[in-house]
Swiss-Prot record:
Chain segments carrying region Disordered: 231-253, 355-390
Location(s) in or outside the cell: Nucleus
Species name: Mus musculus (Mouse)
Gene behind the chain: Lhx4
Protein name listed in UniProt: LIM/homeobox protein Lhx4
GO biological process: animal organ morphogenesis; apoptotic process; medial motor column neuron differentiation; motor neuron axon guidance; negative regulation of apoptotic process; placenta development
Region (Interaction with DNA): 161-181
InterPro entries tied to this protein: HD, Homeobox_CS, Homeodomain-like_sf, Lhx3/4-like_LIM2, LHX4_LIM1, LIM_Homeobox_TF, Znf_LIM
Role: May play a critical role in the development of respiratory control mechanisms and in the normal growth and maturation of the lung. Binds preferentially to methylated DNA.
GO-annotated cellular components: nucleoplasm
């Protein structure tokens, strides 16, 4: 900004004849009309000479006689200079003269008549509540709350969505492979390349990271689920094997004890220690030992360490005559030929031998109602029984 005043030229301008004796190179030229100045007074602004009639404002063309302002080689009056280069109103984008009263909102400056609501055009006075938008526009409180309620209702009914093309998606995916969380300048570059808003790019990366995290969590949960299912399946299989094994081996201990008493009662035995097993006779003594031969058929298999033998069928019991009871307090050992050797306490040695390969017992055929279903060999259901000695 420069300020200049009209100054008189050195010496009074003489008439033309006198001027003819002066070289023309010494006569100044006007910066406005490029003519030699032959006036009495010469105006000098920006080190240039002007006719008094040529020094005018570049905007309003008003002659400048008292004061002027210059910028970039042009001369302006005070009003036009501040309009062009002074502080501008945020609303109308016009310059504000320094003598005019203004209103300010944060860093924005307004004319008095421009400081108004953009919706209802009501001029805001001192003390009125208003909302300042990012671009400097003003909205009064009543209109802002009304517009916000309308926006909320419309947002609930219709939600705007951003459509991303295949090319844009490919660019974003490649950038995600390089860096799942890119810096701001990378997002700005992607925004310029794809044409998407920077906020859209940022939200896409946030959603992508959340999706990857959710997929990893679901994959881990699926692996643990498969592990637990396999463990449960293996435990269930072993449990079924145990149950099937228990079914193959017979019944439980309580059922076995009950059925044992039932069978023995039907067979005519009086107690569980088989004290009357000696009633089964019909054997032939041979060299201090005897063999049990009731029906001409040998018995099945006797358990190792068992002090008694169970006949193959109840019919074989009725055909055997009675003889004297066996001696108590016998000591038993197992013979290699599937037999049992009984040693008497007084040195009397008797061998109770039962050969394997006899007929199949009818206890497991279900032919009689009084006999439950058992496996073919008594060894399978007498395995877990405890037999007290005589």
């Amino acid at each position: 900004m420069m300020q200049s005043a009209a100054v008189p030229a050195e010496g009074a301008v003489k008439g033309l004849p006198e001027m003819l004796g002066v070289p023309m190179q010494q006569i100044p030229q006007c910066a406005g009309c490029n003519q030699h100045i032959l006036d009495k007074f010469i105006l000098k602004v920006l080190d240039r000479h002007w006719h008094s009639s040529c020094l005018k404002c570049a905007d309003c063309q008003m002659q400048l006689a008292d004061r002027c302002f210059s910028r970039a080689g042009s001369v302006y009056c005070k009003e036009d200079f501040f309009k062009r280069f002074g502080t501008k109103c945020t609303a109308c984008q016009q310059g504000i003269p320094p003598t005019q009263v203004v209103r300010k909102a944060q860093d924005f400056v307004y004319h008095l008549h421009c400081f108004a609501c953009i919706i209802c055009n009501r001029q805001l006075a001192t003390g009125d509540e208003f909302y300042l938008m990012e671009d400097g526009r003003l909205v009064c409180k009543e209109d802002y709350e009304t517009a916000k309620q309308n926006d909320d209702s419309e947002a609930g009914a219709k939600r705007p969505r951003t459509t991303i093309t295949a090319k844009q998606l490919e660019t974003l995916k490649n950038a995600y492979k390089n860096s799942p969380k890119p810096a701001r300048h990378v997002r700005e570059q992607l925004s310029s390349e794809t044409g998407l808003d920077m906020r859209v790019v940022q939200v896409w990366f946030q959603n992508r990271r959340a999706k990857e995290k959710r997929l990893k969590k679901d994959a881990g949960r699926h692996r643990w689920g498969q592990f637990y299912k396999s463990v449960k399946r293996s435990r269930g299989g072993s449990k079924q094997e145990k149950e099937s094994s228990a079914e193959d081996c017979g019944v439980s201990d309580s059922e076995l004890s009950f059925r044992e008493d039932q069978i023995l009662s039907e067979l005519g035995h009086t107690n569980r220690i088989y004290g009357n097993v000696g009633d089964v006779t019909g054997g032939q003594l041979m060299n201090g030992s005897f063999s049990m031969d009731g029906t001409g058929q040998s018995y099945q298999d006797l358990r190792d360490g068992s002090p008694y033998g169970i006949p193959q069928s109840p019919s074989s019991i009725s055909s055997l005559p009675s003889h004297a009871p066996l001696l108590n307090g016998l000591d038993y050992t197992v013979d290699s030929n599937l037999g049992i050797i009984a040693h008497a306490g007084q040195g009397v040695s008797q061998t109770l031998r039962a050969m394997a390969g006899g007929p199949t017992s009818d206890l497991s055929t279900g032919s009689s109602v009084g006999y439950p279903d058992f496996p073919t060999s008594p060894a399978s259901w007498l395995d877990e029984m405890d037999h007290p000695p005589f």
